[in-house]
Regions:
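Terminal, low-structured helical/coil segments at or just beyond the last alpha-helical repeat
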Residues: 112-141
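Register position in tetratricopeptide repeats
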Residues: 36-37, 70-71, 104-105, 135-141
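Canonical tetratricopeptide repeat
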Residues: 63, 97, 131-135
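Canonical positions in the second alpha-helix
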Residues: 49-50, 83-84, 117-118
């Protein structure tokens, strides 16, 4: 009797954990859906829910940084980009967005430092490398 109870209890908790895991995957997908529909308030809600359950999902942090940029919240954008780069220092898109943010804020030294890293790791966004270098030089003058 006690063995049966433990068995059913363990099955119950396993099923509950499995459902919770599946729901967590849906948070990111829902966030993407709303982001693509330009419903940034809903997207932000789902990306934040996702990082509660999956604290190392750099993609959620990256999308939250994009939402912060749209909302003109540079401090929050910077925080999210820093988190992405802690999780994955070679994330090209985060490096690119960080450089643009540094240029916008007038911090050309940080923009140059990030641009050096970006130049070494770029694979998909390399076409933007020359544009960034020109922006840093032009804006610095």
């Amino acid at each position: 009797m006690v063995k049966n109870f433990k068995y059913y209890l363990s099955i119950f908790f396993f099923t509950l954990a499995l459902k919770s895991y599946a729901a967590n995957l849906d948070y990111f997908k829902q966030g993407i859906k709303f982001f693509n529909q330009n419903d940034y308030k809903e997207a932000k809600y789902y990306f934040e829910k996702d990082i509660v359950f999956n604290t190392k999902n750099e993609k959620s942090y990256l999308h939250l940084s994009k939402i912060s940029a749209i909302n003109k919240d540079n401090n929050q954008q910077k925080n999210y980009l820093e988190t992405v780069l802690v999780l994955n220092p070679k994330n090209e898109e985060a490096l690119y967005l960080k450089i643009l943010l540094n240029i916008e804020e007038g911090d050309f030294k940080k923009a140059q430092e990030s641009n050096l890293v970006f130049s070494k790791v770029c694979k998909e966004l390399c076409s933007k490398k020359n544009d960034l270098s020109k922006m840093i030089i032009i804006d610095k003058k």
